[in-house]
Amino acid sequence: MVRRALRLAAGTASLAAGTWLLRALHGTPAALGADAASIRAVSEQSPNYRDGAFVNLDPASMFTLDREELRLIVWELVARHSASRPAAPIPLASPNIYRGDASRLAVSWFGHSTALLEIDGYRVLTDPVWSDRCSPSDVVGPQRLHPPPVQLAALPAVDAVVISHDHYDHLDIDTVVALVGMQRAPFLVPLGVGAHLRSWGVPQDRIVELDWNQSAQVDELTVVCVPARHFSGRFLSRNTTLWASWAFVGPNHRAYFGGDTGYTKSFTQIGADHGPFDLTLLPIGAYNTAWPDIHMNPEEAVRAHLDVTDSGSGMLVPVHWGTFRLAPHPWGEPVERLLAAAEPEHVTVAVPLPGQRVDPTGPMRLHPWWRL
């Protein structure tokens, strides 16, 4: 009897584990993206592609961790009660998304690097991620700390969707597939990323692939693919697709989206070539001393803003923080450090709630909503 019960328990556990594994793997092959040959056919056309991989203009080390440092970081990220989690539910704004003409200059932040930029009558959606996890699986991987503040179907018509690179927290298969049916806008992506989109059914005539310092026109809006200091990859291969930041040059305003990047000397050239920018969206989170070259810290974000603007003019809106736990720093620390670094440099910073729309030309009141 005991032996039979043990066999039954073991069988039940195995079945449960197998069911969980099947659920974890559901959809994973498609989410991994295109095969290497499809990517290489496009990527190898670039002078920035060498020996089978793209390279940074500024050399960048990936990760430098000893075993104990790795253990501490993993523990911090998996612990249910840790400083990297918010102390209370994250408040959301009621999105104020106009159905009429886009503003001269405004931005609505939806969390992490997802934002709706309005510039001179055009709307641009950056790094759209609406999934619950930034992972090839819907069971494992970094999970949202707050829900999307607006439903994808509630977005107004956009004029372009811009992707910075192919990491899961910036390129989400479910969101991309949904946008194909909901929107008519083209996808502007760095070289090689188009292969992922094609493998997911995005029509070729809606994909614009660009190398660094190449541009595309969306009517009167010039969209320029410019360098970033980072890396790429969705599985075992690394750096076979390009990573980028983006400059938006309208008839009257200029905006810059940093994507995902470490600090780079390229910022000065980007500002000289395409700035000065009236608005910057710059990453401030997921930093760590173990990977200083690929993720800026808040102080470096202020420095980058100074590089691409006219002596710190314009407004800095932080992105790449608050939504997914990708590093063990305290949850609200990026904003506190950003504000402390911005004040002596006289840099104007707006920190919108998820879903909040910011107008750089309108009245500003900085409410410390992140101090939960």
UniProtKB/Swiss-Prot annotation:
Lineage: Bacteria, Bacillati, Actinomycetota, Actinomycetes, Mycobacteriales
Keyword Signal part of the UniProt annotation: yes
Family annotation (InterPro entries): Metallo-B-lactamas (IPR001279), NAPE-PLD (IPR024884), RibonucZ/Hydroxyglut_hydro (IPR036866)
Name the record gives this protein: Uncharacterized protein Mb0930
GO CC list: cytoplasm
Protein family according to the UniProt entry: To K.pneumoniae RomA.
Signal peptide residue numbers: 1-33
Pfam name, any one: Lactamase_B_2
SUPFAM superfamilies in UniProt: Metallo-hydrolase/oxidoreductase (SSF56281)
Organism encoding this protein: Mycobacterium bovis (strain ATCC BAA-935 / AF2122/97)
GO molecular function, one term: zinc ion binding
Alphabetized UniProt keyword annotations: Signal
